[in-house]
């Protein structure tokens, strides 16, 4: 039996008297791309925080390829093959595009952890960085300061940095947030290639047209619970989803 790339087993989070997540369970197959949607405050980012180790669940388990990583820290999960981008930009604006990607590569190769101390002559990390920049179409900006990139190109750089850590499971947290309309198509193509490489992808995204055109299944979060998970057409036709997510009844 093939193990899921990612499994959530009755994951819950309680802070004080508030239940933030309630018994969320799902399995994501190797190479599958799943979208995560829901109203603001539904628990989407909290779920990503628990998967990536930023937050610790009060109940349940998180498994990567069958390995229980629930108690492991962020860097340990990264070593286990998990990568993530965030809603807000995570690039170092004062470093060049290549230096940002090289720093990410060194985190995987065991190099320096400070952006101001990494060895400039690290050929292995440089090679990985340039290959990843080529994959996202930013190699021609290698010497450009990351801070002057368009928002769409910053998102591409974040994906290049993620690729440099060689993840098997990827979490994309609202990659289209703040991206201008002229940059959307290029970023969508980068995400398509990321998925086509065989990686398992979970994506939170409010741009519904983009998300529904990319994913194989959609998971719907509502009040901290997993309301539904199915193929996009089935989910969007579900009366419970329409009522909870769209505020409508049918």
Q: Where in this protein do the model-derived segments appear?
A:
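Glycine-rich phosphate-binding loops of nucleotide-dependent enzymes
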Residues: 2-250
